[in-house]
Each structure stands twice: as C-alpha cells, then as structure tokens.
UniProtKB/Swiss-Prot annotation:
Pathway: Secondary metabolite biosynthesis
Protein name as it appears in the record: Cytochrome P450 monooxygenase virE
Cleaved signal peptide residues: 1-25
UniProt-listed InterPro entries: Cyt_P450, Cyt_P450_E_grp-I, Cyt_P450_sf, Cytochrome_P450_fung
Underlying gene: virE
Any one GO molecular function term: heme binding
Length: 551
C-alpha cells in the first residue's frame, strides 16, 4: 500500500499538471479568438510590427469583441463603437482600471505617470487635480501660447521648410512646456526640446517592446538581474533622467512663483495646491511634466499625418484653401473663425481618424467579473480599445484609407461633445480614449490642431517633391508607419512653399506682431490678455458636466 506522503505528492503533481495545462487555453465562455497553445496561449501570434493591422484582421475574423490569451492573462479587444460605449463608458465604474504595466509605470515612471496609474486613491486625487488644471474655463489661459506657437511654426516653415517635421514637434512640445512649466522651447534645435523628443521616443519604444510585454505577463521574470534584462536597465536610466528634467523645471516654477514672475501653467497651479493636498515635490514635478506629455506627441503625430495626407490627396488642400480665402481673405485665421470654417473642422476630424496615433490605445482593466453579449469577462482582464479597427471599419467609414473630410459634412461636434454623445455611432474618433480615462485636455488639442491646419493652408501650398533623376512626383507611402505605444508616419519629404509673396510677408509681419512680447531669450515678458478670444467658443457647461461625470 502506497505511503500517504506518496499519495499526497502524486495528487499534488496531478493537480499542478492539470492547472498548468489550463494556462493559455481559452475557456469556453470567453469571447472567441485565435487558436491557442498550452502555456503561452496566443503569445506566439503577437506581431512584432504593425500590431494594429493584425488586431484589425482579427476583428474582421472574430467580431467586435474577441479575446487574446496571453500566458496567464487575458485581453479583451473591443473593436466597435457600441462595445466601447457599453463597457468603457456605461460601465466605467468597473472598466477604468489599468493592467499592471511594470515597465511603463513602475520602472520608467516611478509609479507617478497618470496615464498608466491603476484605480486607487492617488489616481482619484490626480484626476481631481487634472480637472482643475485642464478644464474648459482654465485652459483658455493657454490660448495665447497656442496663438504664438502657431505663428512661430509658420515662420519655421517659411525659413526652413525641409525641416517641417521638427517644426511640427517644436510647436506641440513648446505648447506642452509652457502649459506644464511656463517656459518656451523657441528653436527646433533647442537642447531641452531635443531631450523631450528623445525621451518620448524612448518611452514609446520601451513600453511597446517585447521585453516589456514579457515582464508584464510573466512577473516571475522580474527576479532576473538587470544584466539579463537590458530593457529594464534602460528603463531605470530613463526614469532618473526624466525625473531630473521635470524636477529642474518644477523648482524653477517655484522660484518664479515666489518672485512674482510666474506665467500661467500647471506647475504653478500645483504649487499653489501642494499645501492643501500634501504631495511631494517629486510627485508634483512628475504630474506637471507627464500630464500633457502624451497629448503633445499625439497632436504632433496627427499634424504629421495631416501634412502627409495633403501630399497624397492634394484635392483636399485646394478645397480647404478656397474656404479659408473666402472667409479670411488676406487675414491670418484665428479661433474666432472656427464656426465659419466647417471644411477645416472636417479636416481636423478626418486627421484624427486617419492617423490616430494611439492605434490600440492604452489598455483598461476590469476590476470585477462581468458579462457582455453572453461572454464572461473575468476580473483583471485587460481591455484593448482597438482604435485603428474602429476608425478603418468600412461599414462605419466607407473607403477608410481615403482622407475624405466630406464624410464629416454637417457634424458640428468638437471632440468633447462627440465623446459624450449617447449615440456611439455619432462619435467621430477615439484618439482621446473613453470612459473615466478620457483625456481631459482634448479641447486644448482641438484648438492646437485647428490653428495649425487653418494657418498652414492659409500661408502655404504643400506639394509633392519631384525626383531629380526620374522627374516623377514622390508620393509618401501611407503604410510606412513607425511602431510603438504610439504609431506615426515614418519621415517623408515635402515641398512647402508660400502661396504668394504677400502671404510670406504676412507671415513675417504676424510673427513680428507678437515677437515684441518676448524677451531676449524668446520667453514671455507678460502673457497678453487680448489674445484669449473669449468670444470664439461659448462655454458649454452641459458637456463640461458630462465629461466630469465620466472622469
């Protein structure tokens, strides 16, 4: 007769093997998905590049709600506007968590990056602070920054048009540094600006890497030393470098506040709130710096996509310029023209749809068991917002890879209004997320995009370059996309020329009109009240309340 310890050992081994055999397999009541392998599930199918295209193909094969088994974890992929509304919006109280993002949050952010925070008391405090910093009323303080930086971008395009990609990123990054810390990045070769570029590129690359995925999905791998995990070592170095940068600017803002020379920015508002909320300088500096960081890069990518689309679909720029000339004539467009430029607003919407930057979003997590469409969704499952698939659904948007602003004719919603529309089919895009994770600064991004698009087309023609050897026009490859947490067009060439000598002279004059407000270091002397254009957009208290209820 076998000894009891032998029976116990065999039983334990059988149980272990049985449970091991279950890892990676899809339970019958889960949403459908690709075939799995034991232990790894669908990990062997995860694409090394162009993940957004594979996720779109799976949506076409398995439907608007499908699952991916990722080792010991599961991801539910939402690929329809209705599913996003039903779960992330209507059930936001349980669908607003974040899966554990070990590399992105713990290693590269010290736990302080709002974008990656899970639901806890710190995140709730951050959301309350962020609403106070970025709500519709407060964000009007930043309109002078948007006006000045868009004029500076025009000057850059006039003086060095071949460097247009850097002028775009300087525009959006300088807006971010002003709104975050109150200082400008006046040159596309500014050391601080280049450091911001490099930091965000590295954040996107490392958090979207296979090494990060392994550490997220298999926590046991975290016990390995850094020399076996070079990505984690780079992540630690990144965090120390970024924290040092943010702290320098945060302490400088404190010095300006104490001396009475501060400019409107998030850091100043946080410093004023620091005593009430009791947070540390490290937390404050990181919140100031990272709160708007993702929005800056998103805006730059959308604008880059717009420039590319104008080369591929030149008929759009012609129609847009006809509208601008009809409404503005020889006057530089401003935010007061927003209601009278419906085709430009349509270009804004189409740019957000066509090159969405966050093609797969930042994943949510459900905090308790739930069911949807007869499927079981387990607690802690990740929820992926399949933005690319929704934006390129031919039933929702016929001929989706064609840049066609006419598809938005009659749609007068801004991004915030569309996001809270009870009819999900009326939502224009999903770039800014959903539910309680909806970006609170989307109205700032809409304004930045409107000014950049309308003013660029007023001043310049965007033309295809010509190959000197063949004489043929060079058309950018719209499928040549840089991968990572954020996707963007790979660098491409363009010929950007003033529409006339008078428009070129007007660009110079418009810059001179505001350059006198800057000191010798090209920083603001004072922020002028007269540039706020308080009449261009009535405050929409109803939609503000709806956004607040979601967030």
């Amino acid at each position: 007769m076998p000894k009891p310890w032998v029976v116990f050992g065999l039983g334990t081994l059988v149980l272990f093997l049985w449970r091991l055999n279950k890892i990676g397999r899809r339970p019958k009541n889960y949403p459908p998905g690709p075939p799995t392998l034991p232990l790894i599930g669908n990990l062997h199918l995860m694409p090394k590049k162009n993940a957004h295209l594979q996720f779109q193909r799976w949506a076409e094969e398995y439907g608007p709600v499908y699952s991916l088994m990722l080792g010991t974890k599961v991801a539910i992929v939402l690929s329809s506007d209705v599913a996003v509304k039903d779960l992330l919006d209507k059930r936001s109280s349980i669908y607003s968590g974040r899966p554990e993002l070990y590399m992105g949050q713990e290693i590269m952010s010290g736990g302080n990056r709002p974008l990656f925070m899970g639901i806890n008391s710190v995140w709730r405090r951050v959301r309350k602070l962020a609403h106070g910093l970025l709500n519709v009323k407060v964000s009007r303080t930043y309109v002078p920054y948007q006006d000045l930086e868009s004029r500076d971008m025009l000057m850059g395009l006039l003086e060095s048009p071949k460097d247009f990609l850097n002028h775009i990123r300087r525009y959006t990054t300088s807006l971010t540094t002003q709104m975050a810390f109150g200082y400008r990045t006046p040159s596309s070769d500014d050391k601080g600006l280049l450091e911001m570029f490099e930091n965000f590129d590295e954040l996107s690359r490392l958090t979207g890497s296979q090494s990060a995925a392994i550490l997220d999905l298999y926590p046991i791998a975290r016990i390995l030393p850094d020399f076996l995990l070079p990505a984690r070592r780079l992540g630690r170095e990144y965090y120390e470098r970024e924290k040092k940068l943010f702290m320098k600017h945060f302490l400088n803002a404190r010095q300006q506040l104490n001396s009475g020379t501060s400019k409107p920015c998030c850091a100043i508002d946080l410093l004023r709130a620091q005593k009430e909320y009791g947070f540390s300088d490290e937390f404050g500096c990181y919140l100031s710096g990272s709160l708007l960081q993702a929005g800056s890069e998103t805006t730059a990518i959308i604008l880059t996509g717009f420039f590319q689309a104008m080369l591929v679909f030149p008929e759009v720029s012609k129609e847009a310029q006809e509208e601008i000339d009809r409404v503005c004539g020889d006057r530089l467009p401003d935010l007061n023209d927003y209601p009278n430029l419906p085709y430009i607003r349509a270009c804004l919407k189409e740019s957000l749809r066509w090159m969405p930057a966050t093609a797969l979003g930042v994943p949510h997590a459900v905090i308790q068991d739930d069911s949807y469409l007869g499927y079981h969704i387990p607690k802690d499952a990740g929820l992926i917002l399949n933005v690319w698939a929704i934006h390129n659904d031919s039933k929702r948007h016929p001929d989706p890879r064609r840049y066609n602003p006419a598809r938005w004719a009659g749609d007068n919603q801004n991004s915030a209004q569309a996001a809270v529309n009870p009819d999900p089919t009326k939502r224009d895009h999903f770039v800014f997320g959903a539910g309680r994770r909806l970006c609170q600064g989307m109205h700032i991004a809409d304004r930045s995009l409107f000014l950049a698009i309308s003013r660029t087309l007023w001043a310049f023609d965007l033309k295809r370059p010509v190959d000197k050897e063949t004489g043929h026009e060079i058309i950018p490859d719209v499928d040549n996309i840089k991968d990572g947490l954020f996707i963007s067009p790979m660098p491409f060439a363009a010929d950007i020329v003033p529409r006339s000598e008078s428009r070129a002279a007007a660009v110079r004059q418009e810059w001179e009109n505001v350059a006198g407000l800057l000191d010798d270091d090209m920083q603001w002397k004072t922020v002028p009240e007269g540039l706020k254009w308080k009449d261009y957009e009535p405050l929409d208290d109803e939609n503000e309340d709806l956004l607040e209820s979601l967030s």
